[in-house]
């Protein structure tokens, strides 16, 4: 254990996902060795993220405005919505350059053991979007692109059950090919692109 501010910094860094005690200590001592202006720059960026970044009121993606860049782009196909778990998954799909529709970010996946049920996710907002016209365009297809793990599959099954009786709506699921138990964000562009192109109809 170190003393005072150094240990406090290590403790706070250790709370970040994927950062263990040794990594936290290494980062802390790196920060102690850099120029003061570098620390000031990092601090300013963190404060700006805290103050300026919000969630898009339409899709739930991160944004610095009410509507994110994708929802504001009139060239995107508003009739097709890709449902993902987290904002990082939006970036994973965007990297494939295979999808020109819009997104809906759930904010997680169903996980009863962790206390995450449908009420904790943005499922109600998805149903509302489907029931209304956005930019004078109705949604005709929902692509479910949750992670290929237990929670993601449970979420996909629940969504299919909620959406299957909606008239004029096609519900699809990205094709198999992604490793079971993996995350969308770690899939390479080619594999994820093929999974999107080869999506299968559920309803």
Swiss-Prot record:
<keyword id="KW-0479">Metal-binding</keyword>
<dbReference type="InterPro" id="IPR015967">
    <property type="entry name" value="Rcmb_RecR_Znf"/>
</dbReference>
<feature type="zinc finger region" description="C4-type">
    <location>
        <begin position="56"/>
        <end position="71"/>
    </location>
</feature>
<keyword id="KW-0862">Zinc</keyword>
<keyword id="KW-0234">DNA repair</keyword>
<feature type="domain" description="Toprim">
    <location>
        <begin position="79"/>
        <end position="179"/>
    </location>
</feature>
<keyword id="KW-0233">DNA recombination</keyword>
<comment type="similarity">
    <text>Belongs to the RecR family.</text>
</comment>
<dbReference type="InterPro" id="IPR003583">
    <property type="entry name" value="Hlx-hairpin-Hlx_DNA-bd_motif"/>
</dbReference>
<dbReference type="GO" id="GO:0006281">
    <property type="term" value="P:DNA repair"/>
</dbReference>
<dbReference type="GO" id="GO:0008270">
    <property type="term" value="F:zinc ion binding"/>
</dbReference>
<keyword id="KW-0227">DNA damage</keyword>
<dbReference type="Pfam" id="PF21176">
    <property type="entry name" value="RecR_HhH"/>
</dbReference>
<dbReference type="Pfam" id="PF02132">
    <property type="entry name" value="RecR_ZnF"/>
</dbReference>
<dbReference type="InterPro" id="IPR006171">
    <property type="entry name" value="TOPRIM_dom"/>
</dbReference>
<dbReference type="Pfam" id="PF21175">
    <property type="entry name" value="RecR_C"/>
</dbReference>
<dbReference type="InterPro" id="IPR023627">
    <property type="entry name" value="Rcmb_RecR"/>
</dbReference>
<dbReference type="InterPro" id="IPR000093">
    <property type="entry name" value="DNA_Rcmb_RecR"/>
</dbReference>
<comment type="function">
    <text>May play a role in DNA repair. It seems to be involved in an RecBC-independent recombinational process of DNA repair. It may act with RecF and RecO.</text>
</comment>
<keyword id="KW-0863">Zinc-finger</keyword>
<protein>
    <recommendedName>
        <fullName>Recombination protein RecR</fullName>
    </recommendedName>
</protein>
<dbReference type="Pfam" id="PF13662">
    <property type="entry name" value="Toprim_4"/>
</dbReference>
<dbReference type="GO" id="GO:0006310">
    <property type="term" value="P:DNA recombination"/>
</dbReference>
<dbReference type="InterPro" id="IPR034137">
    <property type="entry name" value="TOPRIM_RecR"/>
</dbReference>
<dbReference type="GO" id="GO:0003677">
    <property type="term" value="F:DNA binding"/>
</dbReference>
